[in-house]
From Swiss-Prot:
NCBIfam families: gcvP (TIGR00461), PRK04366.1 (NF003346). Its EC number is 1.4.4.2. This is Glycine dehydrogenase (decarboxylating). The glycine cleavage system is composed of four proteins: P, T, L and H.
């Protein structure tokens, strides 16, 4: 509803209250162009209405004929109404004090980090730092993360985060498979590894022919395994000296992975010092809310000789064009967008925002502060152990850092009942054992309450007192950590971890980093296939509510009623949007959703006695995650050609489907295609594959062009993943978090992922767990719930239509200057367009990279470079950008084309021109020695509008070759900046 100007309303008969109530105002906040601007854009395209444009763009054979069936959410809610409704759900959760542990802990998020990172759009709306010159702030924060991991684990090099600890362990397994014993397919897992980790490792192992054996750690050296996974400390709390075992494993030709608790490593000998080849773990307890399981940043660190086999992103140090230190993503040739099925992993989105929070936690506390926290946690555990012993309980693990396991016998249920009465959760180890893990939030009062619980269950009338226990411990020679495992090596010695301990200094450090970067809070980010749309503040607010942020993923079901109702509602919303029958929210990235979907397809074929079906057809234009995921799922990738228009070559598809009919498992297609068009024959593609026994996987990366207009489940798809961090407004966070739900047809619903170890069994024949928590990154799901609730069915459809309108407007305006490579009937595109810069390179020597860097001088993040076609830019404006911002981008692109024309016509030198030397830093522009053939003003202010609003790149063009040849992935000494 559009409100008229109050002055006009006052001159009329008073309206009713109902007429003045506005429920859909959020849609006007979310959708950038107003009605007048949309009409002007439509006129430029030659259409009278948005509906007419959509009729011309989307094939009639796949159009939805009914509104989105959103049920109670069909009508939009105002921001206040949606928040109130979600608050009602949140209030149905019960926030108990959870000592369940098992890899998840309560943590204090320093408020300076909460407000200035997690709640700051300068951080959470940024994209993955593939354009290093405009990403130096978050690259530095991620480099700090890598330095933190390297120091604490004692290994040579760390990546910049993975999805969760369980996934990191699975990645470590496949890493060791690539480099390990050629005659062994056995991966040995100690039986005191976290149960959810064992489950995810098993899920990953089966499709690629790895046999997982689980047993006592002591037997690992005799298992003839290419790799061994140890937990340090173990799930039940034991702190074991694995030095001799690691030597024996190495002597037998195996390698060692250690899943290590990061806080414990501040006081324990790091695994890199006693024989670990790889270390993995979770950084959640470094200031990140537990959030019902996620999102959290995992880590993976390796010995130096394994660095080129690492999965995930890696920040490295290089130099810029002026020879100054600069940061960039290093060794990108390992990644799926380049290596495809030969990549080290299918990981795309990781957990950058959470990694940044964890690194800043270490920066803020420093080594002394972290060690103090660790010693306090260990002391509280020791006090509790002593008190429980005095009450007659037997401690199973005599060594510990923060986790205790007790023999409780017949008192087990009484102990749980007494704890629940005090709103406390303990870990249910077995019918005769109880476990608990303390953390930095555990206070003296909490300890007293726990002692009361143990006393009550024991029938004791006298409760041990904390001060008395403390005196007993102080006078005792007994150590909870074996003296041989006490850490002696220094860590976090770099200056960044030792100078920002006051809030003033920390605040300014965070501001200095965010000022270096371009995020959505500054300008449009027109990245094709990435959907950088508005992440509204009202959507983000609930993320930090305690009722969502402070719930343990394995808390009893009766404490998570509101969470599960919200999740059920969101799943129903996504079912409505996709046209499928069921959705699982467990995958915590799009790559993981792809992987889960392919495992589901395999499970379906196996249930029909056709487990031999393992061929996956993938168009040549597919995103690199598709073949990488297919390879991980144990499938053979067969590439299907595309025709001159960028569509799937139907004749080649028929040929390949017929050729592989006996083994055809699936086809993976993206719709609209990665070429930015709605293929007219998508139904025929689906029918061909079905006729030859395969299933159709529709990649949902481009769902932002389909919501409300068409649905993969209705035009022939059997399974899709979605990217909630694209279509449904979860922010990209500078490279994560993400959520990649997998949506399936009715015949596949029985195969959705379970998680047996936590009791989450939703599907009778479900595949194994694909992430460590039952609902993946649960605490950010309210973002998508809020978006859908505030938009309603009609406005979600309007958003899709506007995204298509914006893309066609940009394509139309830029077509005279840059050829639009692919289009559908009438020269129209879907929600993105590909600009062909290859002819420009031939005529001027200017490359797509030059244009991307020059855009930084104009204050823009570059569109997607050289995907899916080398030498092109793929532009996706989304529905959230206003016409004014679109015109600003168009103006910049046209101005750059004129700069290129000057080179073509000989008015500018082919090497000494503003594109070849872009981006230009302030230091370069004001330097006394200016030797370029173009003016300083041309370098700095190529358009007059930039004078009032100028973004200055902090570094010049990064030297990629130097960075990979001189790989350095730790913090740079301060002297290098001086």
């Amino acid at each position: 509803m559009k409100l008229e100007h109050p002055d006009r309303l006052m001159n009329r008969t008073p309206l009713s209250l109902a007429a003045l109530e506005v429920h859909d105002a959020f849609a006007e906040r979310h959708i950038g162009p107003d009605s007048a601007d949309q009409q002007a854009m439509l006129e430029a395209l030659g259409f009278a209405s948005r509906a007419a444009l959509i009729d011309a763009v989307i094939p009639k054979t796949i159009r939805r004929t009914e509104p989105l069936p959103l049920g109670p959410f069909a009508q939009p809610k105002s921001e206040a109404e949606a928040l109130a409704t979600l608050r009602e759900l949140a209030d149905r959760n019960q926030v108990f004090r959870s000592y369940i542990g098992q890899g998840y802990y309560n943590a204090h998020t320093p408020t300076v980090i909460l407000r200035n990172v997690l709640e700051n759009p300068a951080w959470y709306t940024a994209y993955t730092p593939y354009q290093p010159e405009i990403s130096q702030g978050r690259l530095e924060a991620l480099l700090n993360f890598q330095q933190m991991i390297v120091d604490l684990t004692g290994l040579a090099i760390s990546n910049a985060s993975l999805l969760d600890e369980a996934t990191a362990a699975a990645e470590a397994m496949t890493l060791l498979q690539r480099i390990g014993k050629p005659k062994s397919n056995v991966f040995y897992v100690a039986d005191d590894v976290l149960p959810q980790t064992i489950e995810v490792v098993k899920t990953r192992a089966t499709p690629v022919g790895i046999e997982v054996k689980v047993g006592p750690a002591a037997d690992a050296a005799n298992a003839n395994a290419f790799g061994v996974l140890l937990q340090y400390p173990g799930v039940n709390g034991d702190v074991r000296d694995y030095r001799a075992l690691a030597e024996a494993i190495h002597a037998a030709g195996g390698h060692v992975v250690v899943a290590a608790d990061l806080l414990a490593l501040t006081v324990l000998t790091p695994p890199g010092e006693w024989g670990a080849d790889v270390a993995v773990g979770n950084t959640q307890r470094f200031g990140v809310p537990v959030g019902f399981g996620g999102p959290h940043a995992a880590y993976l660190a390796v010995r130096d000789e394994f660095k080129r086999q690492m999965p995930g992103r890696l920040v490295g140090v290089t130099v810029d064009a002026q020879g100054n230190p600069a940061l960039r993503l290093a060794l990108q040739t390992r990644e799926q967008h380049i290596r495809r099925e030969k990549a080290t992993s299918n990981v795309c989105t990781a957990q950058a925002l959470l990694a940044i929070m964890a690194s800043m936690y270490a920066v803020y506390h420093g080594p002394h502060g972290l060690k103090t926290i660790a010693l306090r946690v260990n002391r509280i555990a020791a006090l509790l152990a002593e008190g429980a012993k005095q009450l007659g309980y037997t401690l199973v693990n005599e060594t510990f850092f923060d986790t205790l396991t007790f023999e409780t016998g017949a008192r087990t249920q009484a102990l749980h009942d007494a704890a629940l009465a005090k709103r406390i959760n303990l870990r249910r180890v077995s019918d005769t054992q109880v476990g608990l893990s303390v953390d930095e939030t555990t206070t003296r009062r909490d300890l007293a309450d726990l002692l009361e619980v143990f006393a009550q269950a024991a029938g004791a009338k006298i409760v041990p007192q904390v001060d008395a226990l403390d005196s007993t411990i102080a006078a005792s020679d007994t150590a909870s950590v074996p003296p041989a495992l006490e850490r002696t090596s220094a860590y976090l010695t770099h200056h960044v971890f030792n100078r920002h301990h006051s809030e003033t200094e920390m605040l300014r450090y965070l501001r200095s980093l965010s000022d270096k970067d371009l995020a959505l809070d500054r300008s449009m980010i027109p990245l094709g296939s990435c959907t950088m749309k508005l992440n509204a503040t009202s959507e983000m607010l609930p993320v930090t509510w305690p009722e969502f942020g402070q719930i343990h993923p394995f808390a009893p079901a009766e404490q998570t009623v509101g969470y599960r109702e919200m999740i059920d509602q969101l799943e129903a919303m996504l079912v409505a949007a996709t046209g499928y029958a069921a959705v699982s929210l467990q995958p915590n990235a799009g790559s993981q959703g792809e992987y889960a979907g392919l495992l589901i397809i395999h499970a379906y074929h196996a249930s029909r006695g056709e487990a031999h079906r393992n061929v996956c057809l993938i168009p040549a234009s597919a995103h690199g995650t598709n073949p990488a995921s297919a390879h991980m799922a144990g499938m053979q990738v067969i590439v299907v050609a595309c025709d001159a228009q960028g569509n799937v070559d139907i004749e080649d598809l028929k040929k390949k489907a017929e050729q592989h009919a006996d083994k055809l498992a699936a086809i993976m297609i993206t719709y609209p295609s990665t070429h930015g068009v709605f293929e007219q024959n998508v139904r025929e593609i689906c029918e061909i594959v079905h006729a030859h026994g395969g299933q159709v996987y529709v990649d949902g990366a481009n769902m932002n062009a389909m919501v409300g207009l068409t649905a993969p489940g209705q035009f022939g798809g059997d399974v899709s993943h979605l990217n909630l961090h694209k279509t449904f407004c979860i922010p990209h966070g500078g490279g994560g978090p993400g959520v990649g739900p997998v949506a399936v047809g009715a015949h596949l619903a029985q195969f959705l992922p379970n998680q047996i170890s936590s009791g989450y069994e939703r599907a009778p024949n479900g595949i194994g767990a694909v992430s460590g928590a039952p609902y993946g990154s649960a605490s950010i799901l309210p973002i998508s719930w809020m978006y859908i609730a505030m938009m309603g069915a009609k406005n979600l459809t309007a958003a899709t239509e506007t995204a298509i309108l914006n893309a066609n407007y940009v394509a139309k305006k830029l077509a005279p200057h840059y050829p639009v490579l692919y289009s559908g009937p009438g020269g129209l595109v879907a929600h993105e367009c590909i600009l062909d810069l290859r002819p420009i390179k031939e005529t001027s020597g200017i490359t797509v990279d030059d244009v991307a860097k020059r855009l930084a001088d104009y204050g823009f993040h570059a569109p997607t470079m050289s995907f899916p076609v080398p030498g092109t830019l793929m532009v996706e404006p989304t529905e959230s950008e206003s016409k004014e911002e679109l015109d600003r981008f168009i103006e910049a692109m046209i101005a750059i084309r004129e700069e290129i024309r000057a080179v073509e016509e000989g008015r500018s030198d082919r090497e000494d021109n503003p594109l070849k030397h872009a981006p230009h830093t302030a230091a370069v522009v004001i330097a006394n020695d200016w030797k370029h053939a173009y003016a300083r003003e041309t370098a700095a202010y190529p358009l007059p509008t930039l004078i009032a609003k100028k973004y200055w790149p902090p570094v010049g063009r990064a030297d990629n070759v130097y960075g990979d040849r001189n790989l350095f992935c730790s913090c740079v000494p301060i002297a290098d900046y001086e």
